[in-house]
């Protein structure tokens, strides 16, 4: 699998952009705030319908314009796919595959798999539980079409339940309708908890090997899934918390409050680990994501690497670059020295200056 080309129109700081990409490594270099990350964001958005930064659609449309367009040409199993995405202010985004509009993000499943790796990902260990849930969900949504649909349904139900909890203060008669949302929330929540639990077991098999290699065998990494409540007790917990939820006007229990605990040699490194340990563990998790996707789809995902090398020491740079040698990779950076010193093969180089992309001679 690889991306053949990308076109942008009125996206972020790009008036218009057309790029043909190499199947191997594509480097985008330039000073900060020139638009390098915007290219990766556009590709990830087009392939998943989500911004890796959680940006709103209207914020990605170029200032002063009413709409934006992204086109991505993908080659997979000798088949070609054209993915078009239209963003319009105050309207839902439109996505089409080979000219046919799709209604759900899950219809992109099986067309392109993207792994985004940014400096923020290196803080996944020390940041709050929301970041670790996001890591889980981004991975599972690319691997399991049913999970993607179930998660969307669950989030919708929680949002509707929270809205109802707020409305109860002025319309107490609506209380009986909570039963409907509670039953549906428990149904979809159990599915999510079970899928997350299964995935963590598979993740541990991979992450232990990678982390062992990264640390020279000095550390054994273990990821522990910490559900807010078990699948078996979810419905009863929701029921038991109802009065509390009505006072707080929000849903206090469920998989939207799950967390992960990352242990190195039996020690919780979020609390007791050094920054170096936390970053190495985060790198192990992201590399595991790549290997699991490869194994599941029996193909290589496309890696979007946003200025991560500058955050790693030389040995971890080497390990990362060796790990991605057979994957189409788009890398942003401020210079080429790291790649030259590691004698890393580069297939195409692009210079980015204030929203203009060129290939140096």
Where are these regions (language model features)?
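Helix-to-loop junction immediately C-terminal to a conserved catalytic motif
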Residues: 44
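Nucleotide-state sensing region of NTPase/ATPase domains
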Residues: 47-125, 129-131, 140-143, 147, ...
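A conserved P-loop NTPase coupling/switch region
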Residues: 106-114, 118-183, 359-360
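Structural recognition of the conserved hydrophobic beta-strand(s) that form the central parallel beta-sheet
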Residues: 72, 328-335
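Conserved NTPase motor "head" modules and their coupling/switch loops across ABC/AAA+ ATPases, GTPases
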Residues: 1-31, 172-302, 311, 315, ...
């Amino acid at each position: 699998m690889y991306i053949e080309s990308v076109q942008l129109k009125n996206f972020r700081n790009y008036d218009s952009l057309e790029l043909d990409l190499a199947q191997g490594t594509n480097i985008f270099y330039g000073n900060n705030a020139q638009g390098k990350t915007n290219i990766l964001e556009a590709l990830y958005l087009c392939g998943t319908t989500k911004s890796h930064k959680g940006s709103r659609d209207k914020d990605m449309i170029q200032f002063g314009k009413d709409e934006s367009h992204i086109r991505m040409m993908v080659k997979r199993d000798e088949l070609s796919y054209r993915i078009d995405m239209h963003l319009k202010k105050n309207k839902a985004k439109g996505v089409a595959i080979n000219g046919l509009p799709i209604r759900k993000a899950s219809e992109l499943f099986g067309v392109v798999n993207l792994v985004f790796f940014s400096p923020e990902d290196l803080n996944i260990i020390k940041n709050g539980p929301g970041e670790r849930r996001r890591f889980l969900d981004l991975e599972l949504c690319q691997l399991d079409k049913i999970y993607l649909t179930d998660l969307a349904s669950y989030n919708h139900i929680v949002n509707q339940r929270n809205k109802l909890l707020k409305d109860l203060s002025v319309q107490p008669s609506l209380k009986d309708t909570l039963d409907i949302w509670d039953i549906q929330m428990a149904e979809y929540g159990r599915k999510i908890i079970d899928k997350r639990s299964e995935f963590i077991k598979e993740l541990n098999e991979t992450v232990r090997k990678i982390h062992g290699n990264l640390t020279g065998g000095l550390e054994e990494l273990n990821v522990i899934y910490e559900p807010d409540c078990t699948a078996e007790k979810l419905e009863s917990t929701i029921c038991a918390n109802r009065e509390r939820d009505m006072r707080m006007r929000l849903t206090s229990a469920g998989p939207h409050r799950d967390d992960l605990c990352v242990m190195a040699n039996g020690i919780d490194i979020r609390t007791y680990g050094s920054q170096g340990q936390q970053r190495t563990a985060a790198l192990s998790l992201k590399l595991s994501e790549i290997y699991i996707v490869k194994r599941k789809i029996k193909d290589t995902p496309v890696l979007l690497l946003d200025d991560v090398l500058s955050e790693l020491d030389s040995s971890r740079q080497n390990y990362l670059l060796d790990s991605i040698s057979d994957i189409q990779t788009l890398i942003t950076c401020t210079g080429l020295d790291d790649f030259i010193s590691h004698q890393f093969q580069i297939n195409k180089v692009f210079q980015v200056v204030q929203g203009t992309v060129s290939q140096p001679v």
